């Protein structure tokens, strides 16, 4: 048998080392792939989060602070009181924004609520800057186009199967889920329902605390207890 020369031995060595390095890379990829998949929290974890007392306390603090700011802004002395919605609609908007902030923008519905709030604020500033008589014609035109769009969507929805129609309705109810797939819509709906349940519990607790507390003291009266939202 012929002996392998040192030169040929050197030529053979890199192939074995490269194959070993390829194997090690494949092993690393296999090990790293499960960790990359487990980034989004499971529905059970999100349900536990919204049902915890700690999360309810965080939301309660944010909501009370937001309601105080709303009360101050709606006073006649405030400059922005005319542009702010009043009554139940204003409270609803504030409660939803506080809920989205408590969610930290980790879900589609929370990001949609926060982006909507930013858009509304931008529109209000734009209306204050520009006062044009042509705005009335533009608004009527936009209302007509919205009505036409709604009728087209209804006709399209009638041709869809029953399951797809229900998914469409569900995706419209949950913010930020209009163009999402069924698994995403179901995941977002589960999280949104759990968050709304916590919102109801918190608002009920705040309402009972406000109704049971004595009225705020009159000016000049000392020693009275302060109102929760005062």
UniProtKB/Swiss-Prot annotation:
Keywords: DNA-binding, Nucleus, Transcription, Transcription regulation
Annotated ranges, domain bHLH: 147-196
GO terms of biological process kind: regulation of DNA-templated transcription
Amino acid composition bias (Polar residues), ranges on this chain: 1-17
Major site of localization recorded for this protein: nucleus
Residue ranges that the Swiss-Prot or TrEMBL entry lists as coiled coil: none
Sequence segments annotated as region (Disordered): 1-52, 210-230
Protein name: Transcription factor bHLH147
